[in-house]
Amino acid sequence: RRNPANQLSLPDSMTSAYPNAKPQTQISPRFGLAYQLGDAAVLHFSYGHFFQMPPMYSLFQNHSFLIAPNDYSTVMGNAELKAEKTVTYEIGLWQQLFPGAGLEVSLFYRDIYNLLSTRIISTYNQIEYGLYSNKDYGNARGLEIKFDLATGPISAWLNYTLQYTRGNADNPQQTFSRSGASMDPVNRFIPMSWDQRHTFN
């Protein structure tokens, strides 16, 4: 009972039990629109919400709620984490260059909410530990250019993506680790570890 994350519920029977995680429901609206411009061009727009389940370790790590006697040595899973939510906007234009060949240029922007983070909690005897939570935010924006060619039985395509990805933490334990090293949290957007500026396919 000395661990604030290990609170037992006491129903009328006075039999202690761990509270159950609450079920979560997500609604994912998506919308797409395409408008033909003449005989050789199409303008398109799309909007959508996408969800991704947290990794299993962040839900069930250290499920026995055992805390090491040293500060910043323990990180616990959290069964009530929210799903990572991405809101995507995209607008693009496809243009036929000549019969069988086309060029598409698209701009996109993504807001990424509920990124995994680590909240710092103190036990009653002032031991600091981490609990996974949904505190971080990121976004991605960029440009995609695609050339497609189809002639007879042969088809090919080339794709180039320019992308900038930023967030307020590079990994779920960044703030926790910095606090353990007596460093202040990052107070600005920084490039994410999965930021890939140029991609050719």
Give short role names for the model-derived ranges.
Residues N6-M14, S64-T74, I120-Y129, T175-P185:
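Flexible, solvent-exposed coil segments and beta strand-coil junctions
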Residues R2-Q7, Q52-S58, A68, I112-T118, ...:
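Outer-membrane beta-barrel proteins
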Residues F108-I112, L116, I127-N201:
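Gram-negative outer-membrane beta-barrel transporters
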Residues Q24-Q26, T74, E84-T86, G138-A140, ...:
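Membrane-spanning beta-strands of outer-membrane beta-barrel proteins
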Residues T25, Y35-Q36, H49, A83, ...:
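Residue-level signature of outer-membrane beta-barrel architecture
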Residues R1-G38, S64, D71:
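Signature of Gram-negative outer-membrane beta-barrel scaffolds
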Residues R1, A34, V42-H44, Y57, ...:
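Residue-level detector of the transmembrane beta-barrel scaffold of outer-membrane proteins
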Residues Q36, H44, G48, Q52-P54, ...:
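Membrane-embedded beta-barrel scaffold of Gram-negative outer-membrane proteins
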